[in-house]
A protein has these predicted regions:
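Short, glycine/polar-rich helix-capping loops at beta-to-alpha or helix-loop-helix junctions
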Residues: 5-13, 78-85, 106
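Residues in the short beta-alpha loop(s) of Rossmann-like NAD(P)-binding domains
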Residues: 7, 75, 101
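Helix-to-beta-strand junctions that scaffold the AdoMet/dcAdoMet cofactor pocket
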Residues: 63-65
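Rossmann-fold dehydrogenase core element
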Residues: 67-70, 82-122
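Short amphipathic alpha-helical segments
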Residues: 15-16, 57-61, 82-84, 108-110
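Short glycine-rich anion-binding loops that position phosphate/pyrophosphate groups of nucleotides
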Residues: 52-53, 74-77, 153-154
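C-terminal hydrophobic helical "lid"/dimerization subdomain
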Residues: 57, 103-154
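Adenosine-nucleotide cofactor-binding segment
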Residues: 1-58
């Protein structure tokens, strides 16, 4: 499993979660070629959680014949997959979308966390931080997930 994101801090974070390696798109001149190089010809599957539509097109180009593109993120602008149909057909790509998993998948995910196999990064912050959290999200500075605490401690 390789992670692709921007910045050294994100790379360290992904490796701490168990990624084999990391590619920083901000410092890699040809991201698609780099991924093909480290995966010996292309990835079997790419899961895109990015909000940038360009990430979806690049991901499709990183796949091997018969590869799977899993779209999880929803682009904030022009939400279209602008990959040539000929590429999808010739490479026999599988394209899936998933916003929320099934109950079974959610229970499996909770079990992985419970057994310590998956260690999510969760930061609890006060509800009053919400405007700043949005700014941090826009700048790509959030690692993991933020949980907003609404109730005051008594």
């Amino acid at each position: 499993v390789y992670g692709v994101d921007g910045g050294a801090e994100k790379g360290e974070f992904l490796k701490s979660l168990g990624a084999t390696g990391y590619v920083d798109f901000t410092t890699t001149p040809n991201l698609i070629e780099k991924v093909k190089e480290i995966t010996n010809g292309g990835a079997d599957a790419v899961i895109v959680t990015a909000a940038n539509p360009k990430a979806f097109v690049q991901a499709a180009d990183m796949l091997v014949v018969g590869g799977t593109l899993s779209c999880v993120g929803i682009p904030s602008e022009r939400g279209f997959l602008e990959t040539p149909i000929s590429s999808i057909v010739i490479k026999s790509l599988h394209i899936t979308g998933n916003l929320v998993g099934s109950l079974k998948e959610c229970l499996e995910a909770v079990d992985l966390v419970r057994r310590g196999i998956v260690k999510p990064k969760v930061t609890v912050r006060p509800f009053e931080d919400l405007p700043e959290i949005y700014k941090e999200l826009e700048r790509g500075e959030i690692l993991g997930r933020i949980v907003l605490k609404i109730a005051k401690d008594e």
